[in-house]
């Protein structure tokens, strides 16, 4: 498919909520897949999820700035019109100074359009500071993978009134701090709708039901390449791992049986 999309901006993303147009967001970690996704994704997230689904670690927290910068550059090389969102890895925004320093690296060393930061009230001041410096920020609340060790696993949010109030307060505070959008993960559907209705910026869900302003999935979950773990919310549109496995097996068999390369794939003198 030829790409005739114009480069999407922060205003384009925000206007989609105003127009009632669902936002399509997905992850990518390399140029090859980013180039394919570019034709369909409004936002491509270079997520620290790559630590699990690309580097096969057990969690996201050991992802480094060097790793995220490398993969963000790769994605930017492949996707020329999608809005590129880079994840700030665990430990890279523990205070305003380090957050500003590391966010600047994404803007100076890659072509990222914005950064994403996990955390509620404790990171509102950091989000505000980055926005004041001209760095576009997407907040991330609800289930936060970077807190998985602290919380003893991946916990669904919005199960009681106290938690619902906290999430609502966090969303409003993040909006007021200047964030252009909010990622809401692993949150009860009805609560996600309340949050989306309570703020003017887009709320993009993952595992948070349909009543938000857009959806994001990890590409290797969506296309069936990551077989170690399948989240309940991740619909598989393809059994990619099995298709690749069959193709590689066929190639290996053809080499072993001297079927490949045939004359069709050989140079003649």
Swiss-Prot record:
Coiled-coil positions: none
Subcellular location: Cytoplasm
Needed cofactors: Mg(2+)
InterPro entries documented for this protein: Pantoate_hydroxy_MeTrfase, Pyrv/PenolPyrv_kinase-like_dom, Pyrv_kinase-like_dom_sf
Note on how the cofactor is bound: Binds 1 Mg(2+) ion per subunit.
Highest taxon, organism lineage: Bacteria
Entry binding sites for 3-methyl-2-oxobutanoate: 48-49, 87, 116
UniProt KW Magnesium keyword: yes
Gene Ontology biological process terms, A to Z: pantothenate biosynthetic process
Catalytic residue positions: 185 (proton acceptor)
Annotated residues for binding of Mg(2+): 48, 87, 118
Gene Ontology molecular function terms on file: 3-methyl-2-oxobutanoate hydroxymethyltransferase activity; magnesium ion binding
Entry GO terms, CC: cytoplasm
The enzyme's E.C. designation: 2.1.2.11
Pathway recorded for this protein: Cofactor biosynthesis; (R)-pantothenate biosynthesis; (R)-pantoate from 3-methyl-2-oxobutanoate: step 1/2
Record field: catalytic activity: 3-methyl-2-oxobutanoate + (6R)-5,10-methylene-5,6,7,8-tetrahydrofolate + H2O = 2-dehydropantoate + (6S)-5,6,7,8-tetrahydrofolate
Record keywords: Cytoplasm, Magnesium, Metal-binding, Pantothenate biosynthesis, Transferase
Main function: Catalyzes the reversible reaction in which hydroxymethyl group from 5,10-methylenetetrahydrofolate is transferred onto alpha-ketoisovalerate to form ketopantoate.
Family membership noted in the UniProt record: Belongs to the PanB family.
Subunit-structure text: Homodecamer; pentamer of dimers.
PANTHER family reported in the protein's UniProt record: 3-METHYL-2-OXOBUTANOATE HYDROXYMETHYLTRANSFERASE
Protein's name in the database: 3-methyl-2-oxobutanoate hydroxymethyltransferase
